[in-house]
């Protein structure tokens, strides 16, 4: 099948869903353009900052569009491109976008409270503590994985200490990234001083993007992975503590232009070349490497269709910057729809890169996507070096923009975990733990330690944990909508399905870990404990975490169900 046809069908479905279903949700729940948002009421210059709607959209999209939509869609294509396409469209429209929009809506209607605080209000303090602990651990794992990914992308040296073939390109992309950070601060100061917005802000952003690429391409920074790792953690520390307007928002705004150029390059490339989708339509309900389609397809596609992490961004940062309630639809629902389109593009690029017999292209999903889109740019006359640097930067930016968002959310989760209502008279140790700088430091140290001791041993659980997070958010939204007298029945199908998906995936993973450990013990204990110990390190951490996730998830679901039964319809005045 022609990949262009697939993209056009997806684009029509997604745009139609935003226009019809998204607006229906907004009308059903109620949007008040005259209401004062938390950003206006609680403006503090750091987290609560009234911001132009499109700038908030840029922040939301760049923060949620991490590695997931590209890697997930391409990896899940092992089941065939049709199941992936169907889940991305159905999941994005009826699951992911609804969850993101709902989380943003609930937070804005509750003074910008994060999801943890919303859970305390509608489900209880125990549920809140459990959820915040889960969020903080989740953020630590994501920080470790994405920081390692970014450092690896910019790394110029191989294991033997010699320069790798792509050293020049990697170093250039790294320098571009640093210049992005520098110019983001300059852009933030300009916006603050002159109150620029709209086309003026966009023109300045584009100029800074061009300057960043010119400087980076001509002055590559050749460093090893360890050095880039330190630079990455220093950056995300400042991104987590500095005011949103000074670094995070302007960087997201600039990055979004780059993402739009990447998406446009992919779309135009598919339009001009209209390559054939070489991946098979459907390979079966079981895959030798991945397992059964249910639930693996759903947890593998992850962010391209639905992601619990998105709700943390919606309620953790975006809700505190929305200037007008009318912007919530494009920020919450629209950003997710665009991410689903990105997942479809990644699927089509991978399909075009596959061999005629259906054999997938060699390399990681990021490498496949990067090479494919860079090839499209070269088709339009862009020099190979420039195209490769651009795509390397885009790939790293997908991880970086999520990384600085999750660092900030992790910091907030840690603060909320130990905070009390009367912080002014709280104990000294509690004030220390809730300090912005200390909580950020602890969060990043946790992530940094995971990069050193092997986060890869627990990373396979990321997909399940992420989807469990979305189910927990949906359960909270059901209670919120009920007590405020709003319709919540559209949340029931995604809630039930996501609970089935996540708990099935976790139980399957748990059983696989038990089997791997017991098999290794049976084979190696008579001869020695070396092999068994290695297997336990690789699988034991997953086993322990899987059990914790199941217990934690069931506990929160139980509290949510209990709260829902006790909650009276329309018992709380509509915000």
Model features per residue range: what roles?
Residues 16-30, 134, 171-215, 225-272, ...:
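Membrane-interface loop-to-helix entry segments
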Residues 16-70, 256, 292, 296:
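Membrane-interface "cap" regions at the ends of multi-pass membrane proteins
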Residues 23-49, 72-75, 85, 89, ...:
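Flexible loop linkers connecting adjacent transmembrane helices
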Residues 2, 69-70, 82, 141-163, ...:
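Transmembrane helix-loop junctions in multi-pass membrane proteins
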Residues 2-19, 76-107, 116, 174-184, ...:
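Extracellular loop-to-transmembrane helix junctions
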Residues 101, 270-284, 334-372:
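Extracellular/periplasmic helix-exit of transmembrane alpha-helices
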Residues 125-140, 334-340, 387, 416-452:
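Loop-to-transmembrane helix boundary motifs in multi-pass membrane proteins
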């Amino acid at each position: 099948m022609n990949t262009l046809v697939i993209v056009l069908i997806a684009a029509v479905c997604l745009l139609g869903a935003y226009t019809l279903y998204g607006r229906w949700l907004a009308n059903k729940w109620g949007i008040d353009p005259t209401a004062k948002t938390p950003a206006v009421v609680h403006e503090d210059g750091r987290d609560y900052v009234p911001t132009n709607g499109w700038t908030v959209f840029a922040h939301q999209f760049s923060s949620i569009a991490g590695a997931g939509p590209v890697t997930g869609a391409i990896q899940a294509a092992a089941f065939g491109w049709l199941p992936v396409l169907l889940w991305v469209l159905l999941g994005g429209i009826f699951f992911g976008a609804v969850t993101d929009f709902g989380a943003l809506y609930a937070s804005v209607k509750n003074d910008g409270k994060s999801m943890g605080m919303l859970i305390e209000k509608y489900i209880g303090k125990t549920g809140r503590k459990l959820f915040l602990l889960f969020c903080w651990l989740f953020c630590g794992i994501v920080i470790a994985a994405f920081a390692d990914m970014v450092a690896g992308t910019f790394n110029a040296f191989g294991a033997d200490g010699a320069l790798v073939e792509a050293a020049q390109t990697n170093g250039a992309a790294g320098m571009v990234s640093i210049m992005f950070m520098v110019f983001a601060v300059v852009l933030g100061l300009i916006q603050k001083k002159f109150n620029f917005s709209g086309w003026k802000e966009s023109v300045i952003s584009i100029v800074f993007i061009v300057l960043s690429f010119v400087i980076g391409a001509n002055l590559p920074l050749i460093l090893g992975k360890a050095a880039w790792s330190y630079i990455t953690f220093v950056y995300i520390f400042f991104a987590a503590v500095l005011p949103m307007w000074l670094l995070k928002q302007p960087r997201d705004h600039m990055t979004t232009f780059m993402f739009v150029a990447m998406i446009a390059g992919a779309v135009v490339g598919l339009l001009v070349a209209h390559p054939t989708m070489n991946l098979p339509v459907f390979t079966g309900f079981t895959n030798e490497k991945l397992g059964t389609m249910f639930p693996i397809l759903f947890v593998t596609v992850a962010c391209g269709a639905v992601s619990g992490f998105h709700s943390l961004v919606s309620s953790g940062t975006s809700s505190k910057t929305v200037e007008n309630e009318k912007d919530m639809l494009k920020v919450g629902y629209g950003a997710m729809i665009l991410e689903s389109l990105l997942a479809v593009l990644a699927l089509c690029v991978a399909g075009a890169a596959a061999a005629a017999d259906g054999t997938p292209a060699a390399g990681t999903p990021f490498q496949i996507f990067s090479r494919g889109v860079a090839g499209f740019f070269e088709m339009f006359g862009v020099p190979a070096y420039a195209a490769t640097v651009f795509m390397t930067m885009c790939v790293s930016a997908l991880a970086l923009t999520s990384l600085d968002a999750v660092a900030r959310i992790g910091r907030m989760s840690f603060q909320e975990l130990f905070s009390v209502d009367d912080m002014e008279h709280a104990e000294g140790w509690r004030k220390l733990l809730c300090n912005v700088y200390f909580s950020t430091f602890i969060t990043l140290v946790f992530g940094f330690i995971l990069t050193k001791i092997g986060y890869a041993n627990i990373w396979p659980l990321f997909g399940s944990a992420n989807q469990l997070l979305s189910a927990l958010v949906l359960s909270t939204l059901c209670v919120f909508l009920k007590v405020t007298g709003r319709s919540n029945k559209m949340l029931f199908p995604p809630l039930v399905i996501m609970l089935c998906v996540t708990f099935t995936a976790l139980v399957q993973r748990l059983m696989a870990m038990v089997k791997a450990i017991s098999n290794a013990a049976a084979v190696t204990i008579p001869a020695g404990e070396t092999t068994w110990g290695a297997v336990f390190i690789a699988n034991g951490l997953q086993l322990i975490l899987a059990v914790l996730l199941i217990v934690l998830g069931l506990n929160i679901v139980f509290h949510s169900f209990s709260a829902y039964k006790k909650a009276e319809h329309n018992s709380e005045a509509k915000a």
